[in-house]
Design a protein with these regions (language model features):
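Active-site nucleotide/adenylate-binding loops and adjacent lid/helix of ATP-dependent enzymes
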Residues: 6-95, 150
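Residue-level marker of alpha-helix boundaries and capping positions
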Residues: 4-5, 66, 144, 185
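Glycine-rich phosphate/pyrophosphate-binding beta-alpha loops
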Residues: 60, 116-119, 183-196
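Phosphate-binding site of ATP-dependent enzymes
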Residues: 67-151, 172-178
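Short, acidic/turn-prone active-site loops that include or flank metal/cofactor-
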Residues: 2-5, 116-117
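Active-site anion/phosphate-binding pocket segments in diverse small-molecule metabolic enzymes
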Residues: 112-114, 152-163
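Conserved metal-phosphate-binding beta-hairpin within the catalytic cores
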Residues: 90, 100, 157-189
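Short glycine-/small-residue-rich flexible loop motifs, especially phosphate/cofactor-binding loops
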Residues: 15, 40, 154, 180, ...
Length: 197
């Protein structure tokens, strides 16, 4: 379980493993501190808008939404203050959901889906912890969207060897859920999503 937690905490590695399992994800670019930064290469790979993310940070720390090339370098510099590894992803536009999965009595159960509607530009720290978002449980989704998201969340849980409770976050693009990240240590406060599910 420790190595699984480390894998899911490392956004880049987790998404690489998920992609190999056939789970759709955003286009992404890896960048390490000290490497030559090619703004053109980043733009060509992920386009704009995009997200610059500290690779190993939680609660949306070190995450910046970038709309054009002139904003990219400052966002990279800020994100490097959080981690020396970055993940730069194309910004997916669509409905955002989170799916809880848990193992109970030797059976894997998928919890009701929660849709996240952020008042901010994305589900950032303020939206998560300062009430700047609305969570709708159960999410009002077309049946086929719900089925595909639940299937993917369960597949990730089983094939990655997750234990306890996990929360997989997706954004729908053209009716297809794209994985954003997996949280294997989800919050359990009254404001947290898993207790609502």
């Amino acid at each position: 379980p420790t190595d699984v937690a480390a894998l899911t905490y490392n956004k880049r590695d987790c998404l690489t493993v998920a992609s190999a399992m056939g789970i759709p994800t955003a286009k992404r670019y890896r960048l390490n501190q000290g490497e030559t930064i090619s703004l053109d290469a980043i733009e060509n790979k992920v386009g704009f808008p995009c997200f610059v993310k500290a690779n190993r940070a939680g609660s949306s720390f070190g995450v910046y939404k970038v709309y054009d090339k002139k904003e990219l370098q400052p966002a990279i510099e800020k994100a490097f203050e959080e981690d020396h590894q970055l993940l730069i992803e194309s910004a997916l536009e669509g409905r955002e959901i989170t799916v809880g999965v848990l193992e109970w009595k030797n059976d894997v159960h998928v919890l009701p889906i929660t849709e996240i509607i952020s008042e901010n530009d994305f589900f950032d720290y303020q939206a998560k912890y300062e009430g700047k978002s609305t969570e709708i449980t159960p999410a009002q989704l077309p049946a086929e969207w719900e089925a595909s998201a639940k299937k993917m969340a369960k597949q990730l849980y089983i094939q990655m060897g997750l234990k306890g409770i996990s929360r997989s976050e997706f954004i729908f693009q053209d009716g297809v859920p794209h994985l954003l990240e997996i949280n294997t240590i989800p919050g359990m406060t009254l404001q947290s999503i898993i207790p609502q599910q």
